[in-house]
Amino acid sequence: MCIFCKIINGEIPAKVVYEDEHVLAFLDINPRNKGHTLVVPKKHYERFDEMPDDELCNFIKGVKKTVEVLKKLGFDGYNIVNNNGRVAGQEVNHVHFHIIPRYEGDGEVVKFGEVKNVDLDEVLKEIKG
């Protein structure tokens, strides 16, 4: 059983900020910023694209409700981050979104790396092929 399933089942304690029948949202134990929260679906799915549409809708609604709760922290903006697969940085194989509140002057910057030289026409051809 994964660590998030253990948290959902109450086997591991967590600082819960929001919960409904579909999602659990709790403070990240290694926060990037004040209020950094993880939102997880209560049903176990490893990747975002594996979730059935109805579960996905409920999950996204839970993410939005979590943001509403976190607004009490008075942040100036926020990042929502989701990694799918090991090479993308996913460390726990249970779908989860990071909500990272942002505060003016906090020094946290989410940037993409070096721009890759990619032929967009070739990529589109491969996708549609």
UniProtKB/Swiss-Prot annotation:
GO CC terms of this entry: cytoplasm
Domain HIT: 3-109
Motif (Histidine triad motif): 94-98
Residues that span the membrane, as ranges: none
GO molecular function: hydrolase activity
Name of this chain's protein: Uncharacterized HIT-like protein MJ0866
Pfam annotation, one family: HIT
InterPro entries, per the entry: HINT, Histidine_triad_CS, Histidine_triad_HIT, HIT-like, HIT-like_sf
